[in-house]
């Protein structure tokens, strides 16, 4: 039952279907399994950051203590938040999009 989303992804990505048309929510181990499937021997790039670092990139960054409450902080945070989890777990992604994370 744990691999059901991955099996659905495989079934829909068979011959005669467009890779870009198959969009799935893939989170946690399902996301990792899908990356192994898509990337194969090439492997994939995955470098998780600590939750604190992702939530407050400027506070924990090189300007720590110098930035204060500037209006651009929220904009910077939104840029940092984009990644494979944002793209494929919080939203949906296709096999084609997963390939962007392969080595």
From Swiss-Prot:
**GO molecular function, one example?**
hormone activity
The protein's matches in InterPro entries, at most eight in alphabetical order, are given as: Insulin, Insulin-like, Insulin-like_sf, Insulin_CS, Insulin_family
Q: Name one Pfam family in it.
A: Insulin
The positions making up the signal sequence are 1-20
Compartment annotation: Secreted
PROSITE patterns attached to this UniProt entry = INSULIN
**Subunit field text:** Heterodimer of a B chain and an A chain linked by two disulfide bonds.
Q: Which family does it belong to?
A: Belongs to the insulin family.
- Indicate what this protein is called per its UniProt record: Insulin
**Highest classification ranks of the organism:** Eukaryota, Metazoa, Chordata, Craniata, Vertebrata
Q: Which gene encodes it?
A: INS
């Amino acid at each position: 039952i744990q691999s059901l989303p991955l099996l659905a992804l495989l079934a829909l990505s068979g011959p005669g279907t467009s890779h870009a048309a198959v969009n799935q929510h893939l989170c946690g181990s399902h996301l990792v399994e899908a990356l192994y499937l898509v990337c194969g021997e090439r492997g994939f790039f995955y470098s998780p950051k600590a939750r604190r670092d992702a939530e407050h990139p400027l506070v924990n960054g090189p300007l720590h203590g110098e930035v204060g409450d500037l209006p651009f902080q929220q904009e910077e945070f939104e840029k940092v938040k984009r990644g494979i989890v944002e793209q494929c777990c919080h939203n949906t992604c296709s096999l084609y999009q997963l390939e962007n994370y392969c080595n």
